[in-house]
């Protein structure tokens, strides 16, 4: 038998080792009987839970899940409030419980941080509501049928509205755009009546490191205060529940035939269905490269408005249908039906002989409700982008004959826009931040004077998205991924497209392409795509070189393949591009900074002198006779 033979071999090995050394092992203090293999019993009629264990019981491995740990922390905080009404002592009890669970290895200190206090508040409200509903149900009639389950589910949307800051405080008006890492919505604050832009980023499968990186970068963005940077107001995190099918099996439905590959790759929340995305942060919508591959990597339509409507019909286990809509490019309404697997907590009969057979049902993968984090970033509303301005300039340039009669083509206007852009880039580079996705769509013109505002910073956690995002197409071939190539094709530097390391000089390449587009009107989109693509090979339009030689020179310098040879934002501000006006402004800014430092130093010296004088006066008062 295996157990006996293994023990015999082990004894022979020990004996050989002892003989080689020449030492005799001392007799054991307690002589235990030799272990033999367990006798075999006929357990065919014994329930599985009562059968004899033949191996040590393996403890289940609990994978680190931020959402689960946040819920556990919220439960601890809720219990602390229930058992200790005093707010101060309740807070102390909560901290003590967290420390205890951290020592036991059940929690991470990260999930107990104050950054998630608002999220825990939402959990506590939901827990309170759930307890009240359960208590009312038990008090009414505990022996009734399961019809109350449908009532509880019908309250899910209302409960989400009660615990959502976004739904409570803001009225969503329209969608402004789809970025690489989320969607931006135009909203109105219900309290002050002002309009804002809120970017919603769906975080899927977040780990501790990922969440810390997101929070750290949000804090960095909050510290950016500059006239040429989109104003940042606040940020918060909420829980959202998304119905995701683990491994979707293609079902032959007529409604699925009209769906494109791009639409079929995401569900109603824009969550990717690729299996490799489970171990990394996944943001709503597709990656920038996949999103822009059909427009900005080739030819981009000026009137390109991505609006889709798709109807998702979700079969609930009670037989009800839940519908959600999303617009499609051609404006048509399409339907997609997903059959949800049964919930283990609720007994149900989920068979239908008319619509599908048992074999079809067994082929479907179970669908689970996953809870993800949604990051909300409230920003200043800027509706006019530089892309819109350039498109209008190109249209008017075809109509205007005299440049003086067409301010959109005037060099002075383009120079003013480019100067403010470079000043904003100089500021963020001075703060140690690389934008990584500078393009006309991410640059805005605000107010009547059309002040330049740089926005839509590509979060560095986008690198986390791309680590394991090796998507696979339908036919099994590897789909193009972005990896570390963050940016849009026409404006991204060569090192970004090659996936190598990049720094602030990568932003300067994008600045060079934007400089060319500001001073070179295009008649067609094909012409624009050809010219901007030719810049990579060092080809500058002859018309630009003749009309604006200084701008053409710096376009050539900024788009060099060697990143170290590109001028910095500071060098641009000190160049002849702005006829020394930028240099004067920069000098004044540096003087103001120096003066502020001197003022701070003088304040410190004055405070020290006042303290010294106070000590001297006290000593003198002590020496005076009574």
Curated annotation (Swiss-Prot):
For ATP, which residues are the binding ones? 176-184, 199
Quote the InterPro entries the UniProt record gives: CC_SR_Kinase, HRI2_3H, Kinase-like_dom_sf, Prot_kinase_dom, Protein_kinase_ATP_BS, Ser/Thr_kinase_AS
Give the location of motif SIFI-degron in residue numbers: 88-107
Which is one Gene Ontology cellular component term of this protein? cytoplasm
* Broad enzyme group: transferase
Post-translation changes: Activated by autophosphorylation; phosphorylated predominantly on serine and threonine residues, but also on tyrosine residues. Autophosphorylation at Thr-483 is required for kinase activation. The active autophosphorylated form apparently is largely refractory to cellular heme fluctuations.
The protein, known as = Eukaryotic translation initiation factor 2-alpha kinase 1
Organism annotation: Oryctolagus cuniculus
Start and stop residues of the HRM repeats: 405-410, 547-552
**Keyword match Disulfide bond:** yes
Task: Note the site residues: Heme-binding.
Answer: 83
Could you state one GO biological process linked to this protein?
integrated stress response signaling
